[in-house]
């Protein structure tokens, strides 16, 4: 068994062994994609005086990812059934109607239609 060294001594030994030159670049930290800023913006529109914990934000982010994945999978299935190679807004709309219950689906479809109309008119 090798002899134990103190934490500081081991760190110093590790640093001395590596030659750092100006050409060496720092590793870039990989960005973690999240819907957190958008969830926060919607929260502030609905309840301006309410905050959200990081745990709740993580849960909301997982929820949004899950719903998007379900919609995408259902839209893909619909396109495949109809022998189409492109997922259009029609497939997305049908997928939403199939996945979401009753009134929630109606609201989602109307908001989606409104967003698509706004996007196409801005072009």
Curated annotation (Swiss-Prot):
Residues 1-30 are annotated as: Disordered. Keywords: Chromosome, DNA-binding, Glycoprotein, Isopeptide bond, Methylation, Nucleosome core, Nucleus, Ubl conjugation. There is a cross-link at residue 118 (Glycyl lysine isopeptide (Lys-Gly) (interchain with G-Cter in ubiquitin)). It comes from the Eukaryota. PROSITE patterns: HISTONE_H2B. GO terms for cellular component: nucleosome; nucleus. The modification N6-succinyllysine is found at residues 44, 114, 118. InterPro entries: Histone-fold, Histone_H2A/H2B/H3, Histone_H2B, HISTONE_H2B_site. It is found in: Nucleus; Chromosome. GO terms for biological process: chromatin organization. Glycans are attached at residue 110. Its main location: nucleus. Phosphorylated by the catalytic component of the Dbf4-dependent kinase (DDK) complex Cdc7. Monoubiquitination of Lys-118 by Bre1 gives a specific tag for epigenetic transcriptional activation and is also prerequisite for histone H3 'Lys-4' and 'Lys-79' methylation. Deubiquitination of Lys-118 by the SAGA complex is involved in activating transcription of a large subset of genes. The nucleosome is a histone octamer containing two molecules each of H2A, H2B, H3 and H4 assembled in one H3-H4 heterotetramer and two H2A-H2B heterodimers. The octamer wraps approximately 147 bp of DNA. Core component of nucleosome. Nucleosomes wrap and compact DNA into chromatin, limiting DNA accessibility to the cellular machineries which require DNA as a template. Histones thereby play a central role in transcription regulation, DNA repair, DNA replication and chromosomal stability. DNA accessibility is regulated via a complex set of post-translational modifications of histones, also called histone code, and nucleosome remodeling. Belongs to the histone H2B family. This is Histone H2B. The gene is His2B.
